[in-house]
């Protein structure tokens, strides 16, 4: 699908919040992964204005409702990380993971894999389910 406006991204985030508990978000820097997560959060009755990119923090938690993870700077899998992230996942109802890696070691099932590609002023969004 092609997203041409912020309103269309808002609508997509709202729809995803009604259908999925877990989002795996792929795309280049500034593609719109965090923006989509803001609108996903809004659909969960979380104020989208408090949702920020977890790039530097690695992980942002919005109560026990939403866990927002960025794996961009996670270079290798290890037992400590795996145990810690799975512990965090088990404590949250909804999960959004940017730059997902090591998916086989995460305790997740039935997720939407969302790829966002920049195309001038629009975004090309592909959604697949697992």
Where do the protein language model's features map onto the residues?
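Short beta-strand-centered segment that lines the nucleotide-binding/catalytic pocket of NTP-utilizing
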Residues: 47-62
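P-loop (Walker A) phosphate-binding loop of NTP-binding proteins
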Residues: 28
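N-terminal pre-Walker A segment at the start of P-loop NTPase domains
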Residues: 1-16
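Short phosphate-coordinating micro-motif centered on Lys-Gly-acidic
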Residues: 78, 86-130
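Conserved lysine of the Walker
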Residues: 33
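Switch II (G3) loop of P-loop NTPases
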Residues: 68-75
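Hydrophobic anchor at the beta1->P-loop junction of P-loop NTPases
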Residues: 25
């Amino acid at each position: 699908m092609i997203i041409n406006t912020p309103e269309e991204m808002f609508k997509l985030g709202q729809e995803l919040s009604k259908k999925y508990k877990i989002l795996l978000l792929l795309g280049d820097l500034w593609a719109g992964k965090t923006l989509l997560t803001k609108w996903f959060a809004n659909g969960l009755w979380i104020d989208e204005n408090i949702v920020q990119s977890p790039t530097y923090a690695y992980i942002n938690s919005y109560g026990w409702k939403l866990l927002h993870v960025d794996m961009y700077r996670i270079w290798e899998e290890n037992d400590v990380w795996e145990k810690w992230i799975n512990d965090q996942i088990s404590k949250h109802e909804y999960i959004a993971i940017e730059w997902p890696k090591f998916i086989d070691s995460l305790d997740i099932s039935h997720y939407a894999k969302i790829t966002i590609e920049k195309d001038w002023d629009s975004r090309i969004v592909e959604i697949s389910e697992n």
